[in-house]
Structure formats: structure tokens, C-alpha cells
Amino acid sequence: MGVSSTTPHLLRAARGEVVDRPPVWMMRQAGRYMKAYRDLREKYPSFRDRSEIPDVAIEVSLQPWKAFQPDGVILFSDIVTPLPGLGIDMDIAEGKGPIIHSPLRTQEQIDRLHPLEPEAALPFIKTILQALRSEVGDKSTVLGFVGAPWTLAAYAVEGKGSKTYSIIKNMAFSDPTILHQLLTKLADAIAIYARYQIDSGAQVVQMFDSWAGQLSPQDYDTFALPYQQRVFQQVKQTHPDTPLILLVSGSAGVLERMAQSGADIVSVDWAVDMADARARLGKQVKVQGNLDPGVLFGSKQFIRDRILDTVRKAGNWGHILNLGHGVLPETPEENVAFFFETAKELNFAGVKN
């Protein structure tokens, strides 16, 4: 047990070890709800500057750590950050998200993409992750993250976020051959990027397939799942002991399929009751989630009740407490503090299943 005592709490739970309470972190825990972040944003208005200048990205990543001591500290970045390294020019517009300047619509454009060389294209990622590991030591788990092939393809083909995804669905259903070529190239690049993050200090990596919930289950099986598997298989070949998390927004219809991806942990959103998620996924699949981010607008008693409800339903093994998606920018900062305080005071012995 000597090794376990110095292994951070979240990493132990993610590996399936028995812990005394669920570890807790929050998606988008570094962000606009924090005054410290808003102050820094005034000095660095460009998202790419905030996420790619190492000293700034390190400071942002550590803001929630210094304020709340979550069990996970995640790299401050964006899922589209590696795209320029493949030859896909992009920017991140404040409040609007990624913008792809020349959306990929033709065979020629896809042929021109080149393999990702992270040491050349993304050296700042190594600097940031090494600094985070150095700062938190064994007191917290450092998380990296990547976008999934379908979701990055959706941005690259649409040119920006979309409500209908009509352009990429047009490609998927009328010219699937070139989309499969793009998805393959993206999967291989994402695997390289995830390995680079792990080699740079990430102890757990989460893959965001944010837009795969826009697919029917049969199309998920064609355009999302095989490429999630391709990424995870490549990462596991070289880093078999690094826990991998998969998140799909709006995943209620594909939850069981997510467990087939090769991920160690399935992130569950609030549209599925955690007890139902556990029943659907089976006892061997670890889970993350799944409070509605809006719960943090409620009273302290309401927040506490919802935390306890989720933890009871998830049970005392293989659960990482989190929101079902990112914390909302309008969330009162003191409620986030209360969420973390309450979660860290829990003990499975005192939470009746």
C-alpha cells in the first residue's frame, strides 16, 4: 500500500482502486465564473494567448487548484489546439468558439493534411503539463484532454460550431469516403497528441466527443465509435496504465456504445439518472459525473442534496464526481467552493447506498 498512499486520489479511483470518497473535479473549472480568470482575460483577451503562452496557461490552470483544491487539475486549452499542427488554420473567437478559416470540403484539402509532430507544433503543452505536475505533486491528479475525431471533423468541415451539422452530415451521407479519410487522419493525430500529453505529465486523459450525440446510434457506430476506438487502442498500446475518459454531449442514446470505445471511464450527463447509467453500463465500467451544472445556482442545501443523491446512486467504486458538462459562466463562485468543500468532506461510510 506504500505506493498507493503517494498516488493521488483521482488517479487511484480512475484505476479502480478502493477509495474512501469519490474524487472530484469540474469541467471548465478554470473559466469565466472565477473573478481571477476574468481579471486575467482583460490582460490577455485572446483565448489562444491564454492557452498557448505557457506562463498564462499555467496560471489559469492553477486558479481553481489554488481556490478549491480539486482532486483533478486539468490543462487549460481547447480541443482544436492541435489542428494547426495538421495544417488546419484556426482561431478561437471569444464567446463563439473555434473558427476554421478554410473549412475542409474537398479531397485535395484532406490530402494536404500532414501528420502531427507535437514537439514542433505544440511545445507549450509539454511546458504547461510539466509545470502543473511540479506544482500539485501528489496532492492532485493532472488531467490532459483531446477532442475526438468526429467532433474535430465537425469543426473542420463546418468551419465553426453548428446547430444542425448539415455540412458534415451531407459529407457523411453523400460522400463518406473522404470523411472516413479525414476521420482516420484525425484519429492518428489525436492518438499522437494524447501520448504526448501523457509523456509530458498528464496522468489521466479525457476525450471530448462533444458532437457525437448529434448522430443516430447507427451513424455513431459508423462515424464516431470506430475512430474513438482507433485513438484509445493506439494510446493503450504505449500507455496501458493511463486511465482514459470519454465524454459525449447528449449521450443518453449511445451510453452502452461509449463503453465499447476502449475508454476506462464513461462520463455521464444529467439527462441520464446515475442509477440508470450504472445499470446500463454494468458493474465493471467506471463512471464520471453527472450533476446538471445548473444545480450550482441552487441553495447550499439543494447542492448538498444533489451531490449526495449522485454519490449514492453511483455507489462506492469507480466514480469520479463531476458535473455532466462544463460549469456555467454565470455560476456564483462561492457555490463552486461549496460544491468542492461538500464533496471533499464525504465518506462512503457515511453515505448510505
UniProtKB/Swiss-Prot annotation:
> Pathway, per UniProt?
Porphyrin-containing compound metabolism; protoporphyrin-IX biosynthesis; coproporphyrinogen-III from 5-aminolevulinate: step 4/4
Query: Any idea which UniProt keywords this protein has?
Result: Cytoplasm, Decarboxylase, Lyase, Porphyrin biosynthesis
Read off the PROSITE patterns from this record: UROD_1, UROD_2
EC?
4.1.1.37
Q: Which GO terms describe its biological process?
A: protoporphyrinogen IX biosynthetic process
Q: Which residues bind substrate?
A: R28, Q29, A30, G31, R32, D78, Y155, S210, H325
One term under GO cellular component: cytoplasm
Task: List site positions: Transition state stabilizer.
Answer: D78
Query: What top-level class of enzyme does the UniProt entry assign?
Result: lyase
Membrane-crossing ranges are: none
Q: What is its main location?
A: cytoplasm
Q: Name one GO molecular function term.
A: uroporphyrinogen decarboxylase activity
Enzymatic reactions:
uroporphyrinogen III + 4 H(+) = coproporphyrinogen III + 4 CO2
Top-level taxon: Bacteria
Q: Write out the annotated subcellular location.
A: Cytoplasm
InterPro entries xref list? UROD/MetE-like_sf, Uroporphyrinogen_deCO2ase_HemE, Uroporphyrinogen_deCOase
Q: Which NCBIfam families match?
A: hemE (TIGR01464)
- State the family it belongs to: Belongs to the uroporphyrinogen decarboxylase family.
Fill in the subunit field for this protein: Homodimer.
Biological function? Catalyzes the decarboxylation of four acetate groups of uroporphyrinogen-III to yield coproporphyrinogen-III.
> What is the protein name stated in its UniProt record?
Uroporphyrinogen decarboxylase
- Origin organism of this chain? Nostoc punctiforme (strain ATCC 29133 / PCC 73102)
